[in-house]
Amino acid sequence: MSMQEAKKENVMRRVVLDKVTVNIGVGESGERLQKAYQLVQELTGVKPVYTKGRKSIREFGVRKGAPIGVKATLRRQAAVEFLKKVLPAVNFRLKQSSFDNYGNVSFGIAEHVLIPGTRYDPEIGIFGMDVAITLVRPGYRTMKRKRKKASIPRRHRVTKEEAINFMKENFNVTILEG
């Protein structure tokens, strides 16, 4: 056995990008929601879905079940390409508090016009958005599938440190304290 074979890493321990979810919460239905739908479709190239209000809040004029936002999920290569497109909007910097203990990363973009390659369209207006990144290891499907579900041991889950290292190595992200 040579030295290179001994140093091979276990493929099941690799951290992989599962999905990127883009969300715009408008807070109301109507014309503004349609514009947000159009914007997410332009940015991602995927047909978005409407998010609905979970409960009625009279002060905000939100009804339970009424569409109040738009989201789109990107997987595989489309997710990587989208991340490379939006990370310059935050100057390739993420706060340490953006990472949770389960391999998820979230950050917000204040105005969509900060994304390189997008222009201001007076008909659409300006929207902020949330970008959520989910990192997993091979074998996570056993937790989600319908038949023969099984739990994943804690040692196989993606930790905060592993998520930070993944983002540093693959997307050249600088991590800020706080």
Curated annotation (Swiss-Prot):
A single GO cellular-component term on record: ribonucleoprotein complex
Free-text function comment from the UniProt entry: This is one of the proteins that bind and probably mediate the attachment of the 5S RNA into the large ribosomal subunit, where it forms part of the central protuberance. In the 70S ribosome it contacts protein S13 of the 30S subunit (bridge B1b), connecting the 2 subunits; this bridge is implicated in subunit movement. May contact the P site tRNA; the 5S rRNA and some of its associated proteins might help stabilize positioning of ribosome-bound tRNAs.
Disulfide bonds: none
PROSITE patterns: RIBOSOMAL_L5
Name by which UniProt lists this protein: Large ribosomal subunit protein uL5
Organism: Sulfolobus acidocaldarius (strain ATCC 33909 / DSM 639 / JCM 8929 / NBRC 15157 / NCIMB 11770)
Residues in coiled coil: none
Keyword list, A-Z: Ribonucleoprotein, Ribosomal protein, RNA-binding, rRNA-binding, tRNA-binding
InterPro entries registered for this protein in UniProt: Ribosomal_uL5, Ribosomal_uL5_arc, Ribosomal_uL5_C, Ribosomal_uL5_CS, Ribosomal_uL5_dom_sf, Ribosomal_uL5_N
Gene: rpl5
PANTHER family in the record: 60S RIBOSOMAL PROTEIN L11-RELATED
